[in-house]
């Protein structure tokens, strides 16, 4: 035997050899009492181990080869009774739970069902809120705002000045346009004044323009057509007396202050 794990056939062969050796030892010991007992004990122990291994091997093979359902009728009946009792207990528990749920659902439906109150599903005139429904309750509202509004008033009275601009009446857009139309001067309208002479216009322009103003002063002499055109001395004296300058002398140069 070279393998460390011998097969069952090798174990049977080894067991037969051990038996034969033990038998020889027994016969020898009877003849020769000086025989070594250690050899006898060793063979006996080896035989015990071999037989134990063979028995475990046979038990394993029998368990695999046998039918696992091959049980006695008594054991099968006991197991069937136990399973039926367990299933019955589970069914009883499930029925009790279902019964409790149905009772709760019926109570819930009865509480909210409309059979007890026929007017529950219809909205009648009595269901609407009236003032009579609130007669039993006393509602008190504090419109003053308490101390909070007083503090706000005191703050604004100290930190702000009264502005009466927003208290006056504000005109509408049409009224404002009417007022603007009345206040603006009408430049295109002709004044209903009598026609003035050339001398009056000259005096008006001289009065309006002063020496301290920046506007240029133009003085243009107009030669009057008289009967005495040859009298140059009279013209010069009239120019000096009038305070004007002849047109031929400065060609209407502007005199600024």
From Swiss-Prot:
Residues 105-120, 127-140, 228-242 have a biased composition (Acidic residues). Residues 88-140, 222-257 are annotated as: Disordered. Keywords: Cell wall biogenesis/degradation. May be involved in cell wall organization and biogenesis. Signal peptide: none annotated. InterPro entries: Ecm13-like (IPR037738). The keyword Signal does not apply. This is Protein ECM13. The keyword Coiled coil does not apply. Residues 92-104 have a biased composition (Basic and acidic residues). The gene is ECM13. PANTHER family: PROTEIN ECM13. One of its GO terms (biological process) is cell wall organization.
